[in-house]
């Protein structure tokens, strides 16, 4: 997952010198390789908490069955409703902060009332990751954006990696924040995108407060089912006696 910065700089300097000397190697175009995380998340995704994902009625029985393992059949329906409600928010940013409060990342208290909006924004219905390229399409399949992205930073607290578009666009698809989750490990991915890299770092403050996308691979029922089971376990295992 890591790229040696100093080695890259030295290599670029050497290539530049060889190009000035007329070396054939200097004329060759250098191709950036995707990071390990970019490779691991390759695929086409839909929002996990959407009718294309875990909110579809076909998953209702699984939600109830999994919840019943931890809280019993009598309380399963209520538990599922609460879990879904936490991730089906309808507002983000300043509106969400007014509603739920502003909290720094080092505040780990989530006991109060809150909702996260976990869906795509800005007209995106599906995201496709292929190598260094990220493409978003709307519900009709029309392209919303498509750019290649390069790693520009990391956040140790969340294990996040930040990527910036190579195309110079200044819009809500300039930066992507990818968390460590991958289909191979947790059956889903978690991410954000936007125009301000610093704002993307704040979970419950600023422009992107209370917005964190959860996504599963489109048409992959095995992933969706496994992600539901994992989500229920993480939220209800403390309730099991």
Where on the chain are the PLM-derived regions?
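Positively charged n-region of N-terminal signal peptides that target proteins for export
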Residues: 1-5
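Bacterial N-terminal signal peptides
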Residues: 8-17
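Boundary at the C-terminal end of the N-terminal hydrophobic targeting segment
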Residues: 19-22, 26-28
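Calycin-type beta-barrel ligand-binding domains and close structural analogs
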Residues: 26, 51, 100-241
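N-terminal helix-cap/turn-to-beta initiation motif at the start of protein domains
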Residues: 27-46
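Internal, charge-rich low-complexity segments
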Residues: 50-87
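Extended, polar beta-sheet/loop recognition surfaces of beta-rich domains
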Residues: 86-91, 97
